[in-house]
Curated annotation (Swiss-Prot):
PTM (free text): Is synthesized initially as an inactive proenzyme. Formation of the active enzyme involves a self-maturation process in which the active site pyruvoyl group is generated from an internal serine residue via an autocatalytic post-translational modification. Two non-identical subunits are generated from the proenzyme in this reaction, and the pyruvate is formed at the N-terminus of the alpha chain, which is derived from the carboxyl end of the proenzyme.
Protein's organism: Bartonella tribocorum (strain CIP 105476 / IBS 506)
Protein's cellular compartments: Cell membrane
Family: Belongs to the phosphatidylserine decarboxylase family. PSD-A subfamily.
Membrane topology type: Peripheral membrane protein
Key words, A-Z: Cell membrane, Decarboxylase, Lipid biosynthesis, Lipid metabolism, Lyase, Membrane, Phospholipid biosynthesis, Phospholipid metabolism, Pyruvate, Zymogen
The protein's name in its UniProt record: Phosphatidylserine decarboxylase proenzyme
Cofactor dependency: pyruvate
Length: 232
């Protein structure tokens, strides 16, 4: 491996969704510096933070169709059994809900938790209250994604937070998706809820830190193991 390749591999990629924000922050830094030089450094700090926010690191993703992987980086804030939101069309039976809160320092790239087919995409406008509040799933701006997997339907809800002002979802209805595939992001602080059939055995708890594509939320087969991984 050449020195240039080594240097290139040491840098975490930046997602293209962040380019306009990074450029805007840097231009503002230059303008502020022209007005008063110390302000340039304040703007530069915000620019560096913006670069960090939109980082898009590759992950080591286990290839096991019986495992449900975390769809987001962040802290697990809720784990409970409840009836999923009616808007998802998942019926009235209880499912396991796991909520993952992403603060402004988390990587905000969202990933598919289990392989399957995208059955529906459901966007709902709403408020921008603190995403840590339980009721944020009912009142905040949100985007629902329902995946038909071999273990049944699984619902994912991207929820905008206090500072988030746009939910991005790249997946489309009828798309075939695989575990760990990038499907969207939420800008500047947010939450992601995932609804899973109760047959799944939990492997996480409230307060735990999750890593998208790498943390196993639960399994549909306790004896299932994997030795295969994908780097993406």
């Amino acid at each position: 491996m050449s020195i240039l390749q080594s240097v290139h591999n040491s840098f975490v990629p930046i997602h293209k969704e962040g380019y306009p924000f990074i450029v805007a922050f840097f231009v503002i830094s230059l303008i502020l510096g022209w007005i008063w030089s110390p302000l340039f450094w304040c703007g530069l700090i915000l620019t560096v933070w913006c670069i960090y926010f939109f980082r898009d690191p590759d992950r080591v993703i286990p290839l096991n169709s019986n495992w449900v992987m975390s769809p987001a980086d962040g802290r697990i804030s809720f784990v409970e059994s409840c009836v999923p939101p009616e808007e998802l069309g998942l019926g009235k039976d209880e499912m396991i809900r796991i909520s993952i809160f992403m603060d402004i320092f988390s990587c905000h790239i969202n990933r598919i938790p289990i392989s399957g087919t995208v059955e529906s995409i459901l966007y709902h406008p709403g408020r921008f209250t603190n995403a840590e509040f339980d009721k944020a799933s009912q009142f905040n701006e949100r985007n629902g994604v329902v995946i038909e997997s071999k273990h049944g339907k699984i619902g994912i809800v991207q929820i905008a937070g206090m500072f988030a002002r746009r939910i991005v979802c790249w997946s489309k209805e009828n798309d075939a998706v695989i575990t760990g595939e990038r499907f969207g992001l939420i800008r500047f602080g947010s939450r992601l809820d995932i609804y899973i059939p109760t047959e799944m055995k939990l492997r996480v708890a409230v307060g735990q830190t999750a890593i998208a594509g790498e943390t196993v939320l639960g399994s549909f087969d306790d004896k299932s193991a994997t030795t295969d991984f994908r780097y993406d």
